[in-house]
Amino acid sequence: MLAFTLRFIKNKRYLATLAGALVIIAGLTSQHAWSGNGLPQINGKALAALAKQHPVVVLFRHAERCDRSDNTCLSDSTGITVNGAQDARALGKAFSADIQNYNLYSSNTVRTIQSATWFSAGRSFTVDKKMMDCGSGIYASINTLLKKSQNKNIVIFTHNHCLTYIAKNKRGVKFDPDYLNALVMHAENGKLFLDGEFVPG
């Protein structure tokens, strides 16, 4: 009888421990969603919270390319489509609801400039050709923009190969961004850290 009682007590303790662990895991899962590529998903609210702690850098791939689509071009064939422009405008509106204070940059291609224009809804932005060159030097270029922006949040319209490079270099994951997908980084003590993939909403 004593042995049965001890086993029963141990089982109750085990079940209590297991239940507690499951509660913790459930809590973590509800707070941190993950993309299929292994990057944490960061929505607007999480981005706003991060921006209160450090300057954030959000790097967007440009909107839908005209020369790779059957959809109507906005204007120049090397730019974006009408659908892409509308998507960029909707994205900019949603983004600005959570992050109002940021400086905007674009690489020097028609598609990124048009994407930034429609995203900004009239906000001025700076064209920087270095945002086209994506390799180990991209971090120095981003830090230069942060200094110019006096460590404000910055948004950059760039290209898929830039986002792919950063995801692989910083977290060792394969990231194949679609149009207007984005990565979130933050600056701390002069270093850049990749936090995850921006997911509007």
UniProtKB/Swiss-Prot annotation:
UniProt cross-references to SUPFAM superfamilies, sorted A to Z: Phosphoglycerate mutase-like
GO molecular function: phosphatase activity
UniProt-listed InterPro entries: His_PPase_superfam (IPR029033), LipoPS_heptP_Pase (IPR011310)
Leader sequence residues: 1-35
GO CC annotations on file: periplasmic space
UniProt entry keywords in alphabetical sequence: Hydrolase, Periplasm, Signal
Catalytic EC class: hydrolase
Intrachain S-S bonds: none
EC number(s) per entry: 3.1.3.-
Protein purpose: Catalyzes the dephosphorylation of heptose(II) of the outer membrane lipopolysaccharide core.
NCBIfam families found in the cross-reference section: PRK15416.1 (NF011945)
Identification of the protein by name: Lipopolysaccharide core heptose(II)-phosphate phosphatase
Species of provenance: Salmonella paratyphi A (strain AKU_12601)
